[in-house]
Design a protein with these regions (language model features):
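Divalent metal-coordination and catalytic microenvironments
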Residues: 40, 56, 61, 85, ...
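Divalent metal-dependent hydrolysis catalytic cores, especially in the metallo-beta-lactamase
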Residues: 117-138, 155-162, 191-204, 213, ...
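Active-site neighborhoods of metal-dependent hydrolases
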Residues: 186-200, 204, 249-393, 397-398, ...
Length: 477
């Protein structure tokens, strides 16, 4: 019987492999030994001004050269794309890019979108992500392996372990730490399993955070945090590497805050806060001196609290983006729209969001490293890829120039990951991870949404085909 089954198993494996190859091929727009992208505008991700009428040569998965089209020569057999009217940007480096999505319920539940999110991230130009917290860590690790092997389409993934949460979690998808020893155990277990970063959460104690940071740093790994029980300055002194959500998550300005407890009234304290005060300036100085990066995640706050507007913060074109709504399941779409309907039209939330934006600008002005992500949680209106574009647009709304915002969303993330020699900007020798958009984001940042081709390791994927392949799936799988 075993002898008869072996040929059948081999046949089925071969059919499966062929199907996966065929599935990948249908989404490829361009693949060749040598590719020439001619007449293209280049925003290289370094913050430099755009360069017009450039030719980018791609070979072996890498950028071979960049130069003026008028003076660049290349072999006649190169696959040439004339990109007049288009802009090449580095692939985005998403630094708060979960693979899970809110499913509603009480208590709140979350499920991995292992089918839809990898394709959407890739389709919309996010070629590298850090998952920044996992509710299904084995799934995330396996997805990374499948993507790296070419069996699944998606971005390059840096896997963050399950949340390091203290007692009092608001959702059952998180393990609650027992003590500092439990934190050490979790860090070492998940580092052994393949996680490359860790995320402390809202109710962690100082002892637990210190233990996690010590164990992670012994292994050359970093710790970020969405904190509440611990203020930013305390966390920086403990040795945390990164803080998520900027000003929104800093509880240290609550007057009667108790150690190791997440206080009520954080938003109220921030509404009263003077960013020019000595306390805020000391926080910024401490973060910069301790080399603590901040992750900007403006879209999740906009979607959750900003009233609809014609443009700017709360723009209906962003919060009710039809292309985004189309990739949601009916249940997910209805749930989000119901949540949006509860947002007060007279909300003073916009002023708080403006203050958070000003804090991020002040942090950068002081020399801090600001990185970017979307955080696809909140009220269910933040979706892979679409939210990443909105984050860049909101950075411009915050007062950064378009090329500065693009740098924050690309090269800055690569620097934090220690990957700046490989990704994050368009330069000879780097991986050919690029997004090709119609228009000029340096003049009109919303053009970043007009993605047509995404190159990952030198292979150009059709953005629209990838998006169409996951219509109605977000909120299901």
């Amino acid at each position: 019987m075993k002898t008869k089954l072996l040929p059948l198993c081999l046949f089925l494996c071969a059919v499966s492999a062929l199907a996966q190859t065929s599935d990948r091929q249908q989404f490829i727009r361009v693949e060749a030994p040598l590719i020439a992208l001619t007449n293209v505008r280049v925003i290289d991700g370094t913050g430099a001004a755009p360069r017009e009428d450039q030719t980018i040569l791609i070979s072996g998965g890498k950028i071979q050269s960049i130069g003026p089209t008028a003076s660049t020569t290349y072999p006649a057999d190169a696959r040439t794309l004339d990109l007049k009217g288009y802009t090449a940007l580095p692939g985005l480096v998403g630094m708060h890019n979960h693979m899970f999505f809110p499913m509603g319920g009480s208590p709140p539940m979350y499920s991995n979108m292992g089918s839809s999110f990898p394709r959407l991230y890739l389709a919309l130009g996010v070629t590298t992500i850090r998952t920044t917290g996992s509710v299904a860590p084995y799934t995330d690790l396996e997805l990374k392996r499948l993507i790296d092997s070419g069996r699944v389409l998606g971005p390059k993934m840096h896997i963050t372990a399950p949340y390091l949460e203290g007692k009092g979690s608001f959702t059952p998808v998180m393990h609650e730490l027992k003590d500092a020893d439990d934190a050490r155990r979790m860090v070492n277990y998940w580092a052994d399993a393949g996680a490359t970063s860790f995320k402390a959460y809202m109710n962690i104690t100082r002892a637990e955070l210190r233990a996690a940071v010590e164990e992670a740093h012994k292994r050359g790994l970093k710790v970020t945090g969405h904190l509440c029980s611990i203020g930013f300055r305390e966390a920086a002194e403990i040795g945390i590497d990164n803080l998520e959500h900027g000003l929104f998550a800093d509880s240290e300005f609550v007057a009667d805050k108790k150690p190791d407890q997440c206080p009520q009234g954080v938003s109220a304290s921030l509404r009263q806060l003077d960013l020019n005060s000595a306390a805020v300036q000391e926080t910024i100085r401490t973060l910069v001196q301790k080399n603590v990066a901040i992750t900007s995640t403006l879209p999740v706050f906009e979607a959750g609290g900003a009233p609809l507007a014609q443009n700017g913060i709360g723009a209906a074109s962003a919060l009710l983006n039809q292309r985004m709504l189309n990739v949601m399941s009916t249940d997910a779409r209805v749930r989000y729209l119901q949540n949006r309907a509860r947002v007060s039209s007279s909300s003073d939330f916009v002023a708080l969001l403006r203050k958070a934006m000003d804090f991020e600008r002040a942090f950068v002005k002081a020399g801090g490293l600001l990185i970017a992500g979307l955080d696809p949680t909140g009220n269910g209106g933040i979706v892979a890829g679409f939210g990443d574009h909105r984050e860049v647009e909101l950075l411009v709304e915050a007062g950064f120039t378009p090329v500065e915002a693009i740098q924050i969303a690309t090269l800055n993330g690569a620097k934090f990951l220690g990957e700046e020699a490989r990704i994050g900007s368009i330069a000879p020798g780097k991986q050919a991870d690029l997004m090709i958009v119609k228009g000029n984001p340096a003049a009109n940042i919303s053009d970043i949404e007009k993605v047509e081709i995404v190159f990952k390791d030198g292979v150009g994927y059709d953005s629209e085909k990838l998006i169409q392949s996951v219509q109605g799936l977000v909120g299901i799988r």
